[in-house]
């Protein structure tokens, strides 16, 4: 048996191709059931995200092309469309690849943690479809523990490398417990949505969303349980916000120094943390002159991100060493499993010979043969049968002058070396 990792990702395929090769929730179970019925395939897990689609299989050696052909048939793709984008990894490299993916080492954003949750979800789908057991099950469980070890033993996840995450991380410097804060999000685009997700991960439950049009703001509000307002209403609610994060396409500032000053008075000068991600600025630069207002811009965040990316790169190098260690440990276990069937077959063969000779000896005793003679005959026949194959191997090695093989056979048979 062999392990296979086959797929495409953001490095090898365009968004258009990744969309065509993706497995949605409506077809993933059917796909798993189909995949494990392909010739030679015994186990399968399908990982499908916006940045990658990968098939992990336990299968007979040489069956990788069958998996590729199945992928093409399932999605109705021509070979020419995917051949240049597909990568395949076997055994040790397949194990290393999965571990790297689980640790975020192969992600678009180095070290991002979301991929681990996505892999766990993919593994759960495979379990529900009864598509995973044995070696592949052990591999995924091992990969989860490797990802946890990397997070614990390195700083790969400790530093913000996206604007949205950096904005929230800065908030944690001002407020040790973000769950106790109320946040005003100005804008309703992709960056603000990511900010909202990071805030929710920090257990922030009180959010306000202000946007030029209410429709988009209401979509965010429904997902995050936020209060909705127009940009014109910001002055009425600004004093409620401990944190303000703004990212709009407005050509002019939305929040001015006077507006913040009035809000601070209403807050009895309780500190307010403001992050302006927009270009051009949403918040007047003069706000930073207020003693209880802490204003950061996208330039401040970019400097933090660059420093943190270097930290992550150093941590990634440490993580790669951990991955290699854990891969070697897993492969030691995996190779040992190959001997289990061999040992079982060898024991079964020996037991079969012993049972046959025992029955023959018992029959001789029933027919009146002397017990000592019957036992001696059984022992002689049993010895001859059990040493027949090793004897043939020794004779063949000696005839060929293969001293290395003779030495190995001596070791295997427990004979003293000359």
Swiss-Prot record:
Catalytic activity reported: (S)-4-amino-5-oxopentanoate + tRNA(Glu) + NADP(+) = L-glutamyl-tRNA(Glu) + NADPH + H(+)
Keywords tagged on the record: NADP, Oxidoreductase, Porphyrin biosynthesis
Pathway(s): Porphyrin-containing compound metabolism; protoporphyrin-IX biosynthesis; 5-aminolevulinate from L-glutamyl-tRNA(Glu): step 1/2
Membrane-crossing residue ranges in chain numbering: none
Statement: the UniProt record of this protein carries the keyword Manganese: no
InterPro entries reported for this sequence: 4pyrrol_synth_GluRdtase (IPR000343), 4pyrrol_synth_GluRdtase_dimer (IPR015896), 4pyrrol_synth_GluRdtase_N (IPR015895), GluRdtase_CS (IPR018214), GluRdtase_dimer_dom_sf (IPR036453), GluRdtase_N_sf (IPR036343), NAD(P)-bd_dom_sf (IPR036291), Shikm_DH/Glu-tRNA_Rdtase (IPR006151)
Active site: 50
Domain-related comment: Possesses an unusual extended V-shaped dimeric structure with each monomer consisting of three distinct domains arranged along a curved 'spinal' alpha-helix. The N-terminal catalytic domain specifically recognizes the glutamate moiety of the substrate. The second domain is the NADPH-binding domain, and the third C-terminal domain is responsible for dimerization.
Additional comment: During catalysis, the active site Cys acts as a nucleophile attacking the alpha-carbonyl group of tRNA-bound glutamate with the formation of a thioester intermediate between enzyme and glutamate, and the concomitant release of tRNA(Glu). The thioester intermediate is finally reduced by direct hydride transfer from NADPH, to form the product GSA.
Protein name: Glutamyl-tRNA reductase
């Amino acid at each position: 048996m062999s392990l296979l990792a086959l797929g495409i990702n953001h490095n090898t395929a365009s968004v258009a191709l990744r969309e065509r090769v993706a497995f949605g929730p409506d077809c993933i179970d059917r796909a798993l059931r189909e995949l494990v019925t392909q010739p030679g395939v015994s186990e399968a897990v399908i990982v499908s995200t916006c940045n990658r689609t990968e098939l992990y299989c336990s299968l007979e050696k040489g069956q990788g092309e069958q998996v590729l052909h199945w992928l093409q048939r399932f999605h109705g793709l021509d070979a020419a469309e995917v051949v240049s984008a597909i990568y395949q990894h076997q055994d040790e490299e397949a194990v290393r690849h999965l571990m790297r993916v689980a640790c975020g080492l192969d992600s678009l954003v180095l070290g991002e943690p979301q991929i681990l949750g996505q892999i766990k979800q993919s593994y759960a789908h495979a379990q529900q479809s009864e598509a995973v057991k044995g070696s592949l099950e052990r591999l995924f469980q091992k990969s989860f523990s490797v990802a946890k070890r990397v997070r614990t033993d390195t700083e790969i996840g400790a530093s913000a490398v996206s604007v949205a995450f950096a904005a929230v991380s800065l908030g944690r410097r001002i407020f040790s417990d973000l769950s106790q804060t109320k946040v005003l999000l100005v804008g309703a685009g992709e960056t603000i949505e990511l900010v909202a997700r990071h805030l929710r991960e920090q257990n922030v439950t009180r959010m306000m969303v202000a946007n030029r049009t209410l429709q988009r703001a209401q979509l965010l509000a429904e997902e995050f349980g936020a209060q909705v307002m127009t940009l014109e209403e910001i002055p009425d609610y600004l004093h409620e916000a401990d944190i303000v994060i703004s990212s709009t396409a407005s050509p002019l500032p939305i929040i001015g120094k006077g507006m913040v000053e009035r809000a601070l008075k209403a807050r009895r000068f309780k500190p307010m943390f403001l992050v302006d991600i927009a270009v051009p600025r949403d918040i007047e630069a003069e706000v930073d002159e207020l003693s209880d207002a802490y204003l950061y811009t996208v330039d401040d965040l970019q400097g933090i991100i660059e420093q943190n990316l270097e930290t992550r790169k150093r941590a990634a190098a440490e993580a790669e060493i951990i991955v290699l260690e854990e891969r070697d440990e897993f492969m030691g276990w995996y190779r040992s499993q190959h001997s289990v069937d061999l040992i079982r077959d060898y024991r079964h063969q020996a037991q079969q010979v012993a049972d046959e000779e025992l029955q023959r000896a018992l029959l001789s005793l029933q027919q009146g043969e002397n017990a000592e003679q019957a036992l001696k005959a059984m022992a002689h026949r049993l010895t001859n049968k059990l040493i027949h194959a090793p004897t043939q191997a020794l004779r063949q090695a000696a005839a060929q002058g293969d001293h290395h093989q003779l030495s190995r056979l001596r070791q295997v048979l427990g004979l003293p070396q000359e």
